[in-house]
């Protein structure tokens, strides 16, 4: 076991503080509309240019192991805020540094760290309650666009694209961000249930130019096993042929005699039919087939449920206004399922998302929810160079997450204004605390609430303390617009922050800063001296 280097008390706190400060200094320059970029060297390829706080934080690793512990803890603040709210990582880092730096001064002066932490926690609860009171729900397309624009560093094009995507797919829909091949940033929306399985034979196509099979007013047969023989399959085919409607068959696989029969009927009898493999694998496949059944108002024909293919009737088949099948994917538009059943299924999936601990499972469940409830929007980000594209893609990601957070919990006046508006409420609460050190802990939070606003002002080349005093002297929604160097009503000006982002940033910052304040010892490995570890080769340095 390697020997350890241990630091105690004042020495430990100084090391943590240096690490926290080093990371925070690199991250906080990106805050606000006039925040600067950070260029990150990469081991291969061109350097990365970013204004995203969590991206900067993740790249920082300090040489001194004790200082690095402090930096890693603040990195955790940024990561946790990104995980919970998807944005606000720079604000969280600024708050964490402000709470820890002020707390450290008081611990050094003799305050009890445990009481300070209790005071900090109580103050944060008061501020969070006040934030929820100030918050107002998102009601209009315009507000969504404003939130996205602010989060994308005042890029109105990105803001409008995200608002349009949200409007088209709804709050349960899925918005994904991809790299485009051209210069333009565009939005593609796939409405209805879409899955990446195409037709099993090109003979099913109805449009030779687009190589697609389009079925109008189609019936949908959903079966969870392979179909290879024609005997069991024939009764349902005859019923569909008599009805005169087209048929989409979704099964684990369709092969041999069954596939040949479908192709022959398509070519010779003009029977409008298309066969595709079921999406997904294992239990996820079964769940997706059930989703399709509910969406189309049909039944999943499953032998596990005592159903047999030969006994299938027309009433068991799903129905859809339109089905589009290409070589690679299938889209079911306007499934005619019962609306209440679809909503109940969506609620069930939401519950599974809440209960799931796996990020991968959550992502897959979210995809299923999106396909059932609204559709999928893809924002394809274009730019002149790869470096610019990556930087723009980061901003689109931030804006997308901020928008979802705003829809979930509402919006606040932005630019650090909302936290400053909580100062009078917290000031009134502090005298209620009976423990003196708890009062000091609450005052630490009180002072930290103005840190994001001061940093936004500093990045715009202004004196933060003066700007903060001016904002405090004004009415509720009025704040400092750093882009235009003016005081304005932040809600009317469209400078908005999602409530969830502000709340998560404060909670994460206070949690980690409180832990750091109550730290009394640091234990790290002593680095090995690599120069003396390898023995000299025999005969090295001799002349022959």
Swiss-Prot record:
Q: Which GO terms describe its biological process?
A: protein refolding
Gene Ontology MF terms: ATP binding; ATP-dependent protein folding chaperone; isomerase activity; unfolded protein binding
Does this UniProt record's set of keywords contain Hydrolase?
A: no
- Any single Gene Ontology cellular-component annotation: cytoplasm
Q: Does the keyword Calcium apply?
A: no
* Record InterPro entries: Chaperonin_Cpn60_CS, Cpn60/GroEL, Cpn60/GroEL/TCP-1, GroEL-like_apical_dom_sf, GROEL-like_equatorial_sf, TCP-1-like_intermed_sf
Q: Where in the cell is it found?
A: Cytoplasm
- By its UniProt entry, which Gene3D superfamilies does this protein fall under? GroEL, GroEL-like equatorial domain, TCP-1-like chaperonin intermediate domain
The UniProt catalytic activity note for this protein reads: ATP + H2O + a folded polypeptide = ADP + phosphate + an unfolded polypeptide
Q: What does this protein do?
A: Together with its co-chaperonin GroES, plays an essential role in assisting protein folding. The GroEL-GroES system forms a nano-cage that allows encapsulation of the non-native substrate proteins and provides a physical environment optimized to promote and accelerate protein folding.
Subunit relationships: Forms a cylinder of 14 subunits composed of two heptameric rings stacked back-to-back. Interacts with the co-chaperonin GroES.
The Swiss-Prot or TrEMBL record describes its family as follows: Belongs to the chaperonin (HSP60) family.
Q: What is this protein called?
A: Chaperonin GroEL
What organism is listed for this UniProt entry? Chlamydia felis (strain Fe/C-56)
What is this protein's gene name?
groEL
């Amino acid at each position: 076991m390697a020997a350890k280097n241990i630091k105690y008390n004042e020495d430990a706190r100084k090391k943590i503080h240096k690490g926290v400060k080093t990371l925070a200094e690199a991250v906080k320059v990106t805050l606000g509309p006039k925040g600067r970029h950070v260029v990150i060297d990469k081991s291969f390829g061109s350097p990365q240019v970013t204004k995203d706080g969590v991206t900067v934080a993740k790249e920082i690793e300090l040489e001194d192991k004790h200082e690095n512990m402090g930096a890693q803890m603040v990195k955790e603040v940024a990561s946790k805020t990104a995980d919970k709210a998807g944005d606000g990582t720079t604000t969280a880092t600024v708050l964490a540094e402000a709470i820890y730096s002020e707390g450290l001064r008081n611990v050094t002066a003799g305050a009890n760290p445990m009481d300070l932490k209790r005071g900090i926690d109580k103050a944060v609860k008061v501020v969070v309650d006040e934030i929820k009171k100030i918050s107002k729900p998102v009601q209009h397309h315009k507000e969504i666009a404003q939130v996205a624009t602010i989060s994308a560093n005042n890029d109105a094009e990105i803001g409008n694209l995200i608002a349009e995507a949200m409007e088209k797919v709804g709050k349960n829909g899925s918005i994904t961000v991809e790299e485009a091949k051209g210069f333009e940033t565009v939005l593609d929306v796939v409405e209805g249930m879409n899955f990446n399985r195409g037709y099993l034979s090109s003979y099913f196509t109805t449009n030779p130019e687009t190589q697609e099979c389009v079925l109008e007013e189609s019936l949908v047969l959903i079966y969870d096993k392979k179909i290879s023989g024609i005997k069991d399959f024939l009764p349902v085919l005859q019923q569909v042929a008599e009805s005169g409607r087209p048929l989409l068959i979704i099964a684990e696989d369709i092969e041999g005699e069954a596939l040949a029969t479908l192709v022959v009927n398509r070519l010779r009898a003009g029977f409008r039919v298309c066969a595709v493999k079921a999406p997904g694998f294992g239990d996820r496949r079964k769940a997706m087939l059930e989703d399709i059944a509910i969406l189309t108002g049909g039944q999943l024909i499953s032998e596990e449920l005592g159903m047999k293919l030969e006994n299938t009737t027309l009433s068991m088949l799903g129905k859809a206004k339109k089905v589009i099948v290409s070589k690679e994917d299938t889209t079911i538009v306007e499934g005619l399922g019962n609306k209440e059943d679809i909503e109940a299924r969506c609620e069930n999936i939401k519950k599974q998302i809440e209960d799931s601990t796996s990020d991968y499972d959550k992502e897959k469940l979210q995809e299923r929810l999106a396909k059932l409830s609204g559709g999928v929007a893809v924002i394809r980000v274009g730019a002149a160079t790869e470096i610019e594209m990556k930087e723009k893609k980061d901003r689109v990601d931030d804006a997308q997450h901020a928008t979802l957070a705003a829809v979930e919990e509402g919006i606040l006046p932005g630019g650090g204004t909302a936290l400053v508006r909580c100062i009078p409420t917290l000031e009134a609460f502090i005298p209620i605390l009976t423990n003196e050190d708890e009062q000091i802990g609450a005052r630490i939070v009180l002072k930290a609430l103005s840190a994001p606003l001061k940093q936004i002002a500093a990045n715009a080349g202004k004196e933060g303390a003066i700007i903060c005093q001016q904002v405090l002297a004004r009415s509720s929604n009025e704040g400092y617009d750093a882009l235009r160097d003016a005081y304005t009503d932040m809600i009317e000006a469209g400078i908005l922050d999602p409530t969830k982002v502000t709340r998560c940033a404060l909670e994460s910052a206070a949690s980690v800063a409180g832990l750091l304040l109550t730290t009394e010892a640091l234990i790290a490995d002593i680095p090995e001296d690599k120069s003396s570890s390898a023995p000299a080769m025999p005969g090295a340095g001799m002349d022959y």
